C-alpha cells in the first residue's frame, strides 16, 4: 500500500508546528520539515503501510475507502502522477496559514475563525503561520493548499500569493 502524502505533503498546524497529512488522527507536529522527514514516527508509519497494513493514524482513509472505494490517499495518488514528473522530492503545502475569518460556520471553532473567537471571548487564539511558510523548502513546493481561516480575508494569503516560488504549479 502506498500514500504519496507520506513523502510529499507537509501541513502548517495551527500551533505553528509542521505536520504530515491533515486527515491523520493523533498526528505529531515537528519544528522543521527535516525533523519531520527524519522522524521515527514517520518511518514507522511508512513501514506499516509497506507491509500492506493501515497505520492507526490513517483510520479516516481506511474507513472512507471501505465505504466509498476512494479516499484522500487514493486521490493523492492521482495528484502524484501529475506532480512527480516535475520533481522527485516535491512538496504540497497545506494546513492553516492563519485564522482570519469573518464567518462563523456551525462546523468551525475559534482556532480557525477569528469571528467565532471574538464571539467567545476577548482573549481568543490567533494563528499566524506566515513566517513558518517561508521556512519550508521553497524550491520543493509544487502545490499550495492552505486553509483555516478564510483565505480571501487573509492578508498573509495575499502576501504569499504575490511571492510564490516560480516552481509552484497549483494553488487551491
Q: What role is predicted for each listed range?
A:
Residues 65-172:
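Conserved alpha-helical substructure of the radical SAM core
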Residues 1-77:
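Accessory C-terminal segments flanking Radical SAM cores
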Amino acid at each position: 500500500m502506498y500514500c504519496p502524502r507520506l513523502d510529499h505533503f507537509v501541513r502548517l498546524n495551527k500551533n505553528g508546528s509542521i505536520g504530515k497529512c491533515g486527515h491523520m488522527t493523533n498526528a505529531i507536529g515537528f519544528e522543521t520539515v527535516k525533523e519531520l522527514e527524519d522522524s521515527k514516527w514517520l518511518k514507522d508509519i511508512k513501514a506499516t503501510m509497506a507491509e500492506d497494513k493501515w497505520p492507526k493514524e490513517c483510520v479516516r482513509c481506511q474507513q472512507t475507502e471501505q465505504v466509498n472505494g476512494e479516499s484522500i490517499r487514493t486521490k493523492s495518488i492521482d495528484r502524484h502522477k501529475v506532480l512527480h514528473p516535475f520533481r522527485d522530492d516535491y512538496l504540497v503545502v497545506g494546513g492553516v496559514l492563519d485564522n482570519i475569518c469573518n464567518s462563523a460556520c456551525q462546523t468551525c471553532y475559534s482556532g480557525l475563525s477569528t469571528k467565532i473567537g471574538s464571539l467567545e471571548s476577548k482573549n481568543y487564539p490567533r494563528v499566524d503561520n506566515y513566517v513558518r511558510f517561508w521556512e519550508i523548502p521553497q524550491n520543493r513546493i509544487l502545490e499550495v493548499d492552505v486553509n483555516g481561516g478564510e483565505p480571501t480575508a487573509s492578508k498573509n494569503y495575499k502576501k504569499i500569493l504575490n511571492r510564490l516560488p516560480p516552481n509552484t504549479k497549483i494553488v487551491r
